[in-house]
Amino acid sequence: APDPGPGPMGMMGARGPPGPPGKSGEDGNNGRPGKPGDRGAPGPQGARGFPGTPGLPGMKGHRGYTGLDGRKGEPGGAGAKGEPGAHGAAGSPGLAGSRGRAGPAGPAGARAGPLGAAGPPGFPGGPGPKGELGPAGATGPSGAQGSRGEPGPNGAVGPVGPPGNPGNNGLNGAKGAAGTPGVAGAPGFPGPRGGPGPQGPQGAAGQRGLAGDPGTQGVKGDGGPKGEPGNSGPQGSPGPQGEEGKRGPTGELGATGPAGNRGARGMPGSEGRGASGAAGPRGPPGDAGRAGESGPAGLRGLPGSPGSSGPPGKEGPAGPSGQDGRGGPPGPTGPRGQPGNLGFPGPKGPGGEAGKPGDKGATGPTGLRGPPGPDGNNGATGATGPAGGPGEKGEQGAAGAPGFQGLPGPAGGAGEAGKPGDRGLPGDQGVSGPAGAKGERGNPGAAGASGPQGPLGPRGPAGAPGTDGGKGEPGAAGAAGGPGHQGPGGMPGERGAAGAPGGKGEKGEAGHRGPDGNAGRDGSRGMPGPAGPPGPTGANGDKGSFGPAGPAGARGEVGPAGAPGFAGPPGADGQTGARPAGPAGQSGPPGASGPAGPTGARGDXGPPGLTGFPGAAGRVGAAGPAGLVGPPGSAGPAGKDGPRGLRGDPGPSGPSGDQGMVGPPGPSGEKGPSGEPGPAGSPGTPGTSGPLGLQGFVGLPGARGDRGSPGGAGAVGEPGRVGPAGPAGARGAPGNLGLPGMTGPQGEAGREGNPGNDGPPGRPGAPGFKGDRGEPGSSGAMGLAGAPGPAGPSGGAGRGNRGESGPGGAAGAVGPAGARGAAGPSGPRGEKGVAGEKGERGLRGHAGLQGMPGPSGPSGDTGSAGPNGPAGPRGPAGPHGPPGKDGRAGGHGTLGAPGARGPPGYVGPAGPPGSPGLPGPPGPAGGGYDVSGYDEYRAAKDYEVDATLKSLNTQLENLLTPEGSRKLSHPEWSSGFYWLDPNQGCSNDALKVFCDFTTRETCLHAHPGSLARNSNAYMSDETGDLKRAVVVQGSNDVELRFTFSVLEDGCTRTNKPSRLPLLDLAPLDLGGADQEFGLDLGPVCFK
């Protein structure tokens, strides 16, 4: 059957039993706050508050009176060395000094340098003087047989014999006598070249050669041993009072309060949740967390192994062209020329005059830049610069980890007792209990305060004794006891883990200079600095002793002395000769501080500092009940830096940093020692004339000057108004020297005066301008002949003229007369005569003509541009800025109460002795003697003794009481300042006075001669207003006002010596910076 669908809804069933209790509901919201409780009892008195901030400065008081001059102070110690001034501008280069004498030879270097290459051949020397005649050579071997001589002339015809028969031809006749010498034949051809002559004598030693170039830089010495550490510096003075501390951290949580009353019943909770379901499947992995902060930097790694050598550098630029090579060897001898006809040598001509020196050749092109010289040694360590100023305050660092637990401080003093609390309200009257039984006798109670007298009550009946009462309720809690003494310090806790490095603290104040640390190792060599400006010309060195003779050079060929050729192009630098190390020069003055390098990168945070000293003990608080341990609070702010620890040992040298960029100029170093005076600079251009200054005060009269040249006539001034006749003034001080009058007639010649004292030397005049170039000087006298040079090689055989024929041979003996026959035919030609002796050597031929100079070599390539020159000298300091404006005057302070009367002054010096008193009354008559009879017995000498005694008496009196009538003791002295000692005792009370020998006046100068400046004081002429005028107080405490005559511009002057001495001066207003007020006191002169 089809489904009929759900049936009708049944009746509601009965209520089931209650289900099991649900889970506890979530906590309800907090209840509303309860009503405020009653006011608690007043707490104990709080700790003493911090001192208030200092009050504003008070008003400026009046200027006090000037105190008496103190005794002269002891001379102060030498002041600290001043800071060096700015570098002066470099002076213009001085004139070239004359060449200094050669210095002494330096000590031999550790190693001899390599032998330099042979230098180019020197210029040919001049011809030496004629050498002495050498010894005669050994006799040569006999010459070969000469050729047959010419036939002699026919003999003289003999006397005619008697004619005989013609005989046969007779024998040859005897040899005829030698004929007379024939005419000299033409000169023969030159003979063959002779062999070399004998070795000449050893020549004298040549002059000592010049000193060689300095040797190469010696090898750097080993580092010295480490120096002892310096003594500790003195303990620094205590630092200034610290600033007020920051607010302390929040106190610990208080003890748990008492439990509150039970709250009202809450509303029923919402329906509980069911039991927890089973754990779900594992979820997918979450996103990767953020990267943690980087850990602290690790320790520095060990140095890496050295890298492999780099690739070879690029080929350097081509070196400069070498100097011309020496001349080649002479070419092979050419073919023999045709013999010329030999002329006779002419006589030797006189020497020509020396030619004028040629004009200076044009400057050659600049040579190529030489290679850089060897690096110099490291300079001496410069003086430590002054500490830099404090840096700007850094940003607040992150909070540091808490430091280690400090040791417990000493017990603080007991806190002040708290004020007594207010009295509590009286309680309600309790119900009377039944009378108790008699208790045991209690201890006597403390005496109560006496109550007011009550009225006398009626006597009651005696009550029955009551039973003991029950124990009463505990009384109310007493007031908190006073603070207990601080308990003993706990044991120090275990050392906590190292906290994270704290942030950078504020920069501490600059500490005192510590002792010098040990010298650090040599840093790596810096880049070469820029070339410094040329130094001043050094002083001439002492002449050095002659160096040892150099080795003999290879023997050159003797050339004739040629005229100097044109200067060739500069040769290339030769190799450096040996340079023995000279003695170490003194350290130069420290150079100007180099610019400071840039700030390096921030270093790693250092390890935590040592534990600071324990702080001062805080005031003891009231002991609270021990609370539960609260959760750890967040880290408090970093405490202030502890005091600076002792200086640690120097750490090992760090590796060299990279070369920093050029930093800003460092602070000026300490003043170096004075350099040697530089050469005189050229006169500067005159400056523009400054503005006219304010009129100065009249100066003291100067010493009498030399007679001035007469001035021109001044312009005629306008006539002034006639003033009323004033009273006759006291004698005025001597006026300034008037203009010289017209020249008077020639006076008589005075006596010859004593020679005056030497005047001080005048200041050196300005250096003159450089003179024009002088004419070339005439050629100097012939120098002394040089020492004979070594013997040259043997010259070629000279070609002498042919010697004259030798003398005729001796006549042969006359032969016997032949038989008188017919004359025979001529005999055959006789043999050639013996050769004559060798002729003397002919004169030397003239030197050949000077060859033409060779063509100029090609110009060298233009050198590369030189390095940038050093920075120019520091510019002059800018002008001083104008003075700032004056501040407004403060309000007038109230007048102070009059001071107590001062102590009596010191006893003044003894006054001058008074003039002699009038003669006294005549004394009583003495007993007389009649000496008339004795006069003839008195010797004449007695009268002389009396006269001498009397004159001595008057001189003594004049010494003791001088009357001031002495004339000039030293008329030859000149006017000027002298010291006078009035009582001729010790020199402490001597006076410095000006003696004017022309006016015969002695002038005492005021001390001090001038007083305050930059004050404004005037008397208004228009209104007669005297409020701002000067008040002067005299020695009798009388104030002198307004008794001056106005000169000009508010200045006043008085000429009344009765006002002296002046003890005080009271200007009433101070003017601006460009105004002056002062008081100049002129000298007081006595005649």
From Swiss-Prot:
Pro residues bias locations: 189-199, 910-924
Protein's UniProt keywords contain Ribosomal protein: no
GO terms assigned for molecular function: extracellular matrix structural constituent
Chain ranges of the Fibrillar collagen NC1 domain: 929-1087
Stretches for region Disordered: 1-931
Compositional bias segments (type: Low complexity): 83-120, 150-159, 166-187, 201-211, 228-241, 278-321, 335-345, 360-384, 396-408, 443-453, 560-602, 613-640, 677-695, 718-740, 776-788, 813-828, 849-868, 897-909
Biased composition (Basic and acidic residues): 504-515, 829-843
Keywords of the record: Collagen, Disulfide bond, Extracellular matrix, Secreted
Localisation: Secreted, Extracellular space, Extracellular matrix
Keyword tRNA processing: no
GO cellular component entries: collagen trimer; extracellular region
Domain of life, source organism: Eukaryota
Regions annotated as coiled coil: none
UniProt feature, compositional bias: Gly residues: 218-227, 409-418, 466-493, 708-717, 792-812
Pfam families, A to Z: COLFI, Collagen
Similarity remark: Belongs to the fibrillar collagen family.
The protein, known as: Collagen alpha-2(I) chain
Native organism: Epinephelus costae (Goldblotch grouper)
Lineage: Eukaryota, Metazoa, Chordata, Craniata, Vertebrata
